[in-house]
Amino acid sequence: VGFKAGVKEYKLTYYTPEYETKDTDILAAFRVTPQPGVPPEEAGAAVAAESSTGTWTTVWTDGLTSLDRYKGRCYNIEPVAGETDQYICYVAYPLDLFEEGSVTNMFTSIVGNVFGFKALRALRLEDLRIPTAYVKTFQGPPHGIQVERDKLNKYGRPLLGCTIKPKLGLSAKNYGRACYECLRGGLDFTKDDENVNSQPFMRWRDRFLFCAEAIYKSQAETGEIKGHYLNATAGTCEEMMKRAVFARELGVPIIMFDYLTGGFTANTSLAHYCRDNGLLLHIHRAMHAVIDRQKNHGMHFRVLAKALRMSGGDHIHAGTVVGKLEGERDITLGFVDLLRDDFIEKDRSRGIYFTQDWVSLPGVIPVASGGIHVWHMPALTEIFGDDSVLQFGGGTLGHPWGNAPGAVANRVALEACVQARNEGRDLAAEGNAIIREASKWSPELAAACEVWKEIKFEFKAVDTLD
């Protein structure tokens, strides 16, 4: 066939409604808003082309490969209900386009340059179906939910955490003391804030030492295993690994990483180190809202959550449904299931566009954090279930009597909710009564109930289905 130079419409090559998807294809659902005058077939085909083999003009070297084997294909287009000129375009990518075990490479293709494409007004990646053949090239979470419970010897209830505040400005000694008070009071974990790395007021090594002391002292007093998420995030990968190694030498159970600001390559390396060395890995999602909060452009958090499960992390922040940070109930529970379960059915009412089989890749524990306090405990226990970490920062440290009583209040509230649930009571209907009953025999809980009885963060959720 002679080479024919010139520009041709994308849809002639990349829009293939007759295509039957393969079990090995990576499938993507994009929300596409074309520029006025651009037909949806052309827009969908352009997305498939620009995120796979295509470029803006026919090139001579196209003849040296098999486009049919390597091209992305837009195989289905649906109008978005209630929106004019907006479509869900489904694209199938052959597996050969992606390097094994690399979330970085997968994202560079699928959510790379195509998002700056001029023929589109906006583009959002709503969901990805990762084929089992590709899932199997990833280690995934260092340990997963069951192994974590076995390591910590904690079963049958959510775990409790607390982010140490003020997030910046404490000395290492005072920071360690705050950790100790929380852990002694009954929490399972305390947490470095995501922006605590190694600053002039508190260098990382000092913090690690004082927090390790807090862990060992509180473990000795309570007879429970305790942890503090030591943030290993750093300016270079070498420095990050140095911090992880030091944490392992201290014998602590868990470290933490900011996976979006730190990057997927660094995260995957750290996850491999954590599995090899018995460390749990807590993941913070700082920067996610830059990517996922706009409805029409960017990437939905469920995609970032899937990517994290592949790259590796044992915990990840996932919104609260009830606190100060974003999260609409059905949608949040949709990606919480994607993190924890082995098999998730397609369910558009929860924003899940594809059935996903994780073929026994370990699960990730979702972390509910942000503006939550004791009055939220029944709702959180009901919504998130046992396999979750409930994190109360201000909701622990803001207690009028101090950190340890704040921790006691949270632990009593949690134990009361778990017991009530196990006795068959309805947490949604009786939640406030359950907390009030428990506060009768816990002065710490009674004081917490009094402080936060009126606090609500009532705003309309941005992340709705449509």
From Swiss-Prot:
Pfam families according to UniProt: RuBisCO_large, RuBisCO_large_N
UniProt PTM: The disulfide bond which can form in the large chain dimeric partners within the hexadecamer appears to be associated with oxidative stress and protein turnover.
Cofactor binding mode and count: Binds 1 Mg(2+) ion per subunit.
Organism phylogeny: Eukaryota, Viridiplantae, Streptophyta, Embryophyta, Tracheophyta
Species of provenance: Barleria prionitis
Residues that, per the record, bind Mg(2+): 191, 193-194
Gene3D superfamilies assigned: Ribulose bisphosphate carboxylase, large subunit, C-terminal domain, RuBisCO large subunit, N-terminal domain
Gene giving rise to this polypeptide: rbcL
One cellular component term from this protein's GO annotations in UniProt: chloroplast
UniProt-annotated location(s): Plastid, Chloroplast
Catalysed transformations (reactions): 2 (2R)-3-phosphoglycerate + 2 H(+) = D-ribulose 1,5-bisphosphate + CO2 + H2O; D-ribulose 1,5-bisphosphate + O2 = 2-phosphoglycolate + (2R)-3-phosphoglycerate + 2 H(+)
Protein name stated in the entry: Ribulose bisphosphate carboxylase large chain
